[in-house]
From Swiss-Prot:
It is an enzyme of class 6 (ligase). The keyword Signal does not apply. InterPro entries: Bacillithiol_biosynth_BshC (IPR011199), CC_BshC (IPR055399), Rossmann-like_BshC (IPR055398). It holds the Pfam family CC_BshC. GO terms for molecular function: ligase activity. It comes from Chlorobium chlorochromatii (strain CaD3). Belongs to the BshC family. The keyword Ligase applies. Its EC number is 6.-.-.-. This is Putative cysteine ligase BshC. Residues 439-519 form a coiled coil. Keywords: Coiled coil, Ligase. It comes from the Bacteria.
């Protein structure tokens, strides 16, 4: 498998690339040092911080017995085996720490980056064990099912005939704002699986995919059970532990965080706002807009409702308009901790209070909002864990590799390599298209147009001194003529490209095929496509291949992986 690493700073997909903050966080630049110092507690590139984190976590007290018993029960219910059990049992020891990641529940596991997160957590845990053999590190995947954004969770996408095919499960007996985890599938799920499988590559692996999906997704089953059982089947050879945070047993462990949020609200929101201002002063955008109260209330029907604070000592559950005093809210949390659900601000705090989190595996968006949370961690007396970027891949099939070869032939200079063409495609695809058409027609066409514009501008500028001595009022006319001459050349250039495009439809179609494969819907492939397309075509071994790649590469660069077969 040919692989190439691309710097995030040089990637700009057609619609949306990676944020400036994430590019700086993964770069080797002075901006990174400032960002780390202002926004985080630990730097995953500094070895001294690793010893510091080991000491900090070893000194903290966790409810390990309760945590282990809960995880054993949950993973057994999800279909976990001996690998999960052995990994969970290690957490009884104060010398065992967690490498945590997680993702919102998605149909058939959702997009590729869900899989990449899990793989990265597994590999980072292995690497820490090799560095610190006296400690154990276990990978934990947080099942984010308390969200109520059903539409996002209930859809998935595969490639079919060089196009994208979308599949969506419609809500079934679902109340407004009901949590995704407890939403069930209707009889339609069987049809969706059959329709999707029919479009998957017709290989011996396709039957296995169909069987797995039908066994995990069936009428009456909940999103959480289906997602969790699928993940454990995919990672059956790995010690990945799943965690459901919606259970009462987990909420009891997190209760002190909810208590402090109730007692101190809206203090956390003010701290996020202050940190956001600091972040913006560094030139970055703030992702998260905090609320006065940073948790939701889940009613007896499983509906996730906002909690507002109309006055300093009053909380109100929306839309029911139920009002409670601060004391009443504390009593409610004491009696029914399962009714409390952290929002995006409080969620990582809950995670790192309950779990001995050594490191969290995060995506680009998560890095952005975690940069706003340093003062919140300090408010709750917790050190932020290492924030390690998840593995990031673009999987390139042989037919797309052949398009890359053609682009090298058409647009490349002597010595132009595969990595050169990937850098060009990922930094400015539209320019690659333009160059490909122009170079196919005339190798120096783009250069000739640029030269024409420069020569016309220089010729007119040479007149400036003479014209200004004759009549200074001619200078604005000359300046306008320089602009018009450039526009004239650009008009001719555009018409030339259009004429050339008509002559090179086949090449354009191949480039379009590559664009759909590399940047579906104009964004990175990992944000759109489902893993089962690739499993059906290349088998379950693709997970081992990606795992091996992560062992050999740092996760702070994007990896292009050319698949074989």
């Amino acid at each position: 498998m040919n692989t190439f690493q691309l710097d995030y700073r040089h990637i700009q997909t057609p619609k949306k690339g990676f944020s400036a903050l994430f590019r700086d966080y993964t770069a080797d630049a002075p901006e990174r040092e400032t960002l780390i110092a202002e926004c985080f507690h630990l730097d995953y590139r500094k070895s001294a911080d690793y010893y510091r984190q080991l000491g900090l976590l070893s000194a903290r007290t966790f409810q390990r017995e309760s945590l282990v018993n809960m995880l054993l029960r949950q993973n057994s219910r999800f279909g976990g085996g001996e690998r999960q059990q052995q990994a969970i049992e290690k957490l009884r020891s104060p010398r065992c720490m967690a490498v945590v990641t997680g993702q919102q529940l998605g149909l058939f596991t959702g997009t590729l980056y869900t899989i990449y997160k899990a793989l990265t957590a597994i590999i980072v845990a292995e690497q820490q064990k090799s560095l610190f053999p006296d400690y154990d590190f276990v990978p934990i995947f947080w099942l984010e099912g308390e969200d109520h954004d059903y539409d996002e969770s209930a859809s998935t996408t595969i490639f079919a005939e060089n196009q994208l095919k979308h599949f969506t499960h419609q809500p079934y007996r679902r109340l407004p704002d009901q949590t995704v985890a407890n939403s069930s599938f209707s009889d339609d799920i069987r049809t969706i699986i059959d329709e999707m499988v029919a479009l998957l590559p017709n290989t011996p692996h396709r039957t296995m995919v169909a069987e797995m999906l039908h066994e995990c997704y069936y009428p009456g089953c909940t999103f959480e059970i289906s997602f969790a059982s699928t993940m454990l089947r995919l990672f059956r050879n790995y010690p990945l532990i799943l965690l459901s945070p919606q259970e009462s047993d987990f909420k009891k462990l997190a209760m002190p965080i909810f208590f402090k949020e109730i007692e101190s609200a809206p203090a956390v929101s003010y701290q996020v706002i202050a940190q956001s201002t600091r972040l913006e002063s560094l030139g970055y955008s703030a992702q998260t807009k905090p609320r006065a109260v940073n948790f939701f209330y889940v009613n007896q029907h499983g509906q996730r409702q906002k909690v507002e604070q109309p006055s300093s000592d009053t909380f109100q559950i929306v839309p029911e308009k139920q009002r409670l005093s601060r004391h009443q809210m504390l009593e409610l949390c004491q009696d029914h901790p399962e009714r409390f659900s952290p929002n995006v601000v409080l969620r990582p705090i809950v995670q790192d209070y309950v779990l001995p989190t050594f490191a969290t595996i995060v995506g680009p968006g998560e890095i952005n909002y975690m940069a706003q949370y340093r003062p919140i961690y300090e408010h709750f007396g917790i050190t932020m864990p290492f924030l390690v970027p998840r593995g990031s891949f673009t999987l390139v099939e042989p037919k797309i590799s052949r398009v890359m070869d053609k682009l090298i032939h058409v647009t490349g200079q002597p010595g132009f390599s595969r990595k050169n063409i990937y850098n060009a495609v990922f930094s400015n695809l539209q320019q690659v298209k333009k160059n490909a058409i122009g170079e196919a027609e005339h190798p120096q066409l783009a250069t000739m147009f640029e030269q024409a514009k420069d020569e016309m501008r220089q010729a007119l500028e040479r007149l400036n001194h003479t014209l200004s001595t004759i009549d200074p009022t001619l200078e604005p006319l000359l300046a306008a003529s320089i602009v018009q001459s450039a526009k004239l050349v650009e008009t001719i250039e555009q018409k030339t490209w259009k004429a050339s495009r008509r002559k090179h439809e086949e090449l354009l179609e191949q480039i379009q095929k590559a664009e759909t494969a590399l940047f579906p819907e104009g964004v990175p492939q990992e944000r759109v496509v489902n893993i089962f397309y690739f499993i059906a075509k290349y088998g379950m071994g693709i997970l081992d291949d990606l795992s091996n790649l992560l062992k050999g590469y740092a996760s702070d660069a994007h990896i292009i992986a050319e698949l074989q077969g």
